[in-house]
From Swiss-Prot:
Its EC number is 2.3.1.47. Pyridoxal 5'-phosphate binds at residues 112-113, 183, 211, 239. Disulfide bonds: none annotated. It is an enzyme of class 2 (transferase). Substrate binds at residues 21, 137, 358. The gene is bioF. Its cofactor is pyridoxal 5'-phosphate. Pathway: Cofactor biosynthesis; biotin biosynthesis. InterPro entries: Aminotransferase_I/II_large, AON_synthase_class-II, AONS_Archaea/Proteobacteria, AONS_Proteobacteria, PyrdxlP-dep_Trfase, PyrdxlP-dep_Trfase_major, PyrdxlP-dep_Trfase_small. It comes from Paraburkholderia phymatum (strain DSM 17167 / CIP 108236 / LMG 21445 / STM815). Belongs to the class-II pyridoxal-phosphate-dependent aminotransferase family. BioF subfamily. This is 8-amino-7-oxononanoate synthase. NCBIfam families: bioF. The keyword Transferase applies.
Amino acid sequence: MQLLDTLEQGLKEIDARGLRRRRRTVDSPCSAHMTVDGRNMIGFASNDYLGLAAHPLLVAAITEGARRYGAGSGGSHLLGGHSRAHAQLEDDLAEFAGGFVDNPRALYFSTGYMANLATLTALAGRGTTLFSDSLNHASLIDGARLSRADIQIYPHADAEALGAMLEASDAAVKLIVSDTVFSMDGDIAPLARLLELAEHHGAWLVVDDAHGFGVLGPQGRGAVAEAALRSPHLIVVGTLGKAAGVSGAFVVAHETVIEWLVQRARPYIFTTASVPSAAHAVSASLRIIGGDEGEHRRAHLRSLIALTRDMLKSTPWLPVDSHTAVQPLIIGSNEATLDVAASLDRANLWVPAIRPPTVPEGTSRLRISLSAAHSHNDLEQLEHALMKTAEARA
């Protein structure tokens, strides 16, 4: 019983600090308007940035994929589970997101977490130094730790500090690792400067474009395309359960890098391949993202971002200067943040409260996630509820 006692005490401590996380049950497709725990709500919690998760064409595509390929893959990618749908999607992703390198190739993963672990553990090891942004996603942090490489943390988005670290390093292999869009602040890494430093110091740049792919850049090709980067020393990870509206993730790089991952990336090799129907649906999603409808959705999303930025400035709390679909509003303490989120919840608005350890102590916040499925009226309701909450707390 000793372990249970330890766990129960740990949970009590989590509760005492206002850090208990609770799941909510969604009874409807992911969209701006959802049924959550039996209640009709406007959701500002998902990463469905283009509003594609319930798109009829994607629902039809995943249904068609299930009919064609069945319910499951039946094995790992190297042992019978690599379907035509997976192969086609990798070709589509290489063409869509691989414009930054000659001879691009893509590798499809079940999750973004797996893709980051696979990339860092396969490419880095003893004798490698990883230079990691202090606000990188947990999957990049864990991948770096598991790689057994030396890890140097540079201050968030501080290219000058990173340059000094690179200058002082005598590592045989150097990898700079960064999110493109940071998931809790919504800001964008100085990608052009990071690549400049990488090439000057003989390093590689690995970026996680989870929150940029589909939203940023020409035709939604991502943050790397928006920054017009091009280099054989660049590796891009992206996710397919956010703007793409389905599930999974990918790595795009020079074909030699991808072949190395196929041969050496344990999170890729030793797991069952994702369901082929999901891959089939993602290929359909890429056609929407890169077409006229995708551009219309991105334009609408940009208008929502501008409105939200203006609206948050009128609150008594601290908005983060974000030009992306992630719009944080820093409240401060855990208790106050939970109280504000609960007030919005009573107004049938689902806005998650983000607390440590996800964000630093004293910066607990509401994370307002915008989607092209939202309307201007949805934002007006959010603004009204925020103002009413602020008045009640004054």
